[in-house]
């Protein structure tokens, strides 16, 4: 466990932060601050999809909104409750500022991921549409090297998300329900595994139906619950924002911050937790965006950016503000326990119940999203028939995860997750000219024609 933890530290402190932030800066400049120019278009398509007649997902793909809902299902997970709290506890309030920077730059990266996933999506002999980094990795690196790199990425994502990642998510639900309601973790594990398997075997249509229903409900529930706590402590809001901005550059100047926080700690923890949460550049969400039914790849690029904004600037931000306005950092707690404490300052024991319900929605939706990403790679490596075996194995991992000691599993998932960033981001760098061309084509030809 110590060795894997050390590998993760090296990856995040030196390699991934440079790759992901560097990629974000390159794509932001190359695409002319697309985060700002495409912001309105992204929200227009998102809300248009939310309130319009729902499309039916099938072998030809899913609607743009269903693809976003599946991506957000994966992005908004337990990290939004525990990850922000951990960053605050270790890096202090300034970590949130660096989360914002990482998310802003990440919006440009995920735009590139989504449009490449759309451009290189694959239609099988049976008419099923699939896609993801494996296809644009092969487009970026021709021949045997591209095939090997794509296969390595596939194996990493199947283990990181489909097996180990989902085990961690189910453990979060089981432990939260045990704390709040006293239900044995094995009982919770069986229930989650059965429900998950029911969704898995329903294929793309059932996954799309579940995510487009569950994501708006869970987002609204958490947003309202958080805003009530924040506004109950409204006098602390100005200082919370002050501590975030000042703490990013001078952590010692902020009272109520983390003991021993430095600028380096604030930056590394903020960037790492932010990127880990919104998944920009990780190569996970392109699987959902690839199967969206859109007229031009750039349209889904706009929608993908909205996902990062919702994950970080809304959900993660609310967790941070709840913790800061309730002055919970000096308690010495960390992770989900810190978030739980912050909510309980207003809700009492109801805070545990609130977090348990949110944990269920966030973690279960992530299980579905990550399964979907994993099965696309199982299909790529072993063919469509292997998906049935994978769905059963994934459900077994969901059950076992509810009982496991998760530190080792979490660290291994972290490690595989970190490693899969490298082939994905290198492929995006190699395809940066193509990304730029597709982007220019939309604004020059397609957008004017509409």
Where are the predicted features?
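Extracellular/periplasmic helix-exit of transmembrane alpha-helices
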Residues: 111-121, 125, 225-243, 251-258, ...
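Membrane-interface loop-to-helix entry segments
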Residues: 19-26, 34-43, 153, 170-177, ...
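Transmembrane helix-loop junctions in multi-pass membrane proteins
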Residues: 1, 30-35, 79-84, 161-173, ...
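Alpha-helical membrane segments and immediately flanking helix-loop junctions
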Residues: 54-90, 116-119, 125-134, 138-140, ...
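N-terminal alpha-helical transmembrane segments of multi-pass membrane transport
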Residues: 1-74, 78, 89-95, 106, ...
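Helix-loop-helix module between adjacent transmembrane segments
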Residues: 27-28, 102-127, 134, 138-171, ...
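Selective recognition of specific alpha-helical transmembrane segments in multi-pass small-molecule
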Residues: 105-113, 190-204, 215-235, 268, ...
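Flexible loop linkers connecting adjacent transmembrane helices
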Residues: 33-62, 86-96, 108-144, 329-346, ...
